[in-house]
Amino acid sequence: MQTMTSRSMTGHSRFTSTPCGERCRTIARVVLAAAVMAGGFVSTEEAHAAPLMAGAAKVDITNVEAGPVNDPLFVKALVIKSDTTTALIISVDAVAIGEIGHIKNDYLPKVRSRIEKELNIKPTNVLINASHCHGVVCSDVDERTFQAVKLASQNMVAVHVGVGSGHEDRIMENRRLKLKNGREVDVRHAYSMPADEEVAEVGPVDPEIGLLRLDRADGPKAGQTLAVVYNFACHPIQGVPNGGNTADVTGFASKVIEDNLSDGTIALFVQGCGGDINPIMYKDVEHPRSAEPLGNLLGLSALKGLRKVQCKSDERLRVINETLTLPRADVAERIVAMEAEQTRLLKSLKGTSLNLKTFLPLVVKYNLSDEFPSYYSHRYLHDKKLGRDDLGKLDADNRRNMKAYMDNIYTMEELTRVQTNLALLLKHQAQNVAAGKRTIDVEVAGLRIGDLTLITFPGELTVRIGLNIKQKSPHKKTFVAGYTNGYIYYAPTAEQLLNVGGAQEDSDCILAPEWQALFEAKAAEILKKL
């Protein structure tokens, strides 16, 4: 929000001397003083609008009936108000805002409607972001969301605003692998990895932690931090050793932040463009899966950045919420091609002499000694002196049988990838046909708080899209949040959608490739308005 100020009027009169002399100058000074006292003129230094008001709260939303609980899940609310605008950020420890997981599709309209009715906050000014952790929330999550918002709105205080960045590149990796044959696959527990020698390169990550800090502006707690909003791109799906319900990486990170700032600080995580970003060492089989060390690193890196943030009085607050129409995908031809590939792979499987019991010992032997795998070397030398090569022929047979067995394994691994992603394509093709139209309408929001600008989208944006928007933004501090105000599955780049059926991001998607240019153009348009 831009503040209108009057032209500066100082105590030094700018009236020039006239024939009326000192009497006129005296009258002018009296009139000027009266106008200032009446509020008709305000100096630049005195023209500051009232500081932003803010309130923050959190409510536990853990489903305690869904099995063992490792750590709590929360819904957190941050209400920010200027003289003319009220904005609301809600962060939910859940996989999505509707469509998948345990939050139903009526959650967003129900929560917004009640907030508007009872708290008079416009639905378009309500931004609800899912952390994308895979924890299980309680059945009355909508009621508890409203409770958090109400608590926040009842405890508003004047705040100073600071914006900055942190850096963290140790806890995540791009999960899309570019193969030497030009295709791409992804790193999932749903299927196995390609052979190491097939992998050519990996995609980028975004190490920036977007930071917003709100400090109390006055009163006995002046200077203490009321709330922090931090934005980062990574799937928080590492899990915990006991397999219990967890808010995962970002839940632990938020706890680190809250425990190390002022008493009562609320840390809201806003998921970024983490569609193709996994926790580091995601498929490690040597150690228990544990999100806590990764969350601790993220939290400490956020704190390091927060220490450098300077808060100041800044009344700028604006929300822009627009509807964007995007094209739906038609993958019917790709489905036919993948079904043909599925059949080809299945028919390529051949019978082998070996089974698992005989294959594994041979693999060990032939990898321990390439030249003399079947016995000690002297037996090979002995046979050679006698003109025999019995062990050599045995080795040739064993190597041929091992290769046949390995070929079947690689084929079966490829078959599982094809079948898993084909099922996703079939699901979304049916959804798009059932929709009855070739497009889908989505919410794209822009938020400005002081020096911070934020763009939101309801899909699982991949990291390159966030990097593009940040790079082209006219503002110094722009952040991007997927998983916000709804859920429309993955939203990969147009280039990634050339790989349809090869990885989850391009298979678990309802959008046509043209969507990316439309969204990035809309984001640029909104950023200019902010």
Predicted regions and their residues:
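Bacterial N-terminal signal peptides that target proteins for export
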Residues: 4-32, 43-44
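Charged, flexible cofactor/metal-binding loops and thiol motifs
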Residues: 299
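C-terminal segment of classical bacterial N-terminal signal peptides
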Residues: 37-46
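Short regulatory "switch" loops immediately downstream of catalytic or recognition motifs
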Residues: 1-3, 33, 37-38, 211-219
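Conserved beta-alpha junction segments in alpha/beta enzyme cores
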Residues: 49-266, 272-296, 306, 312-530
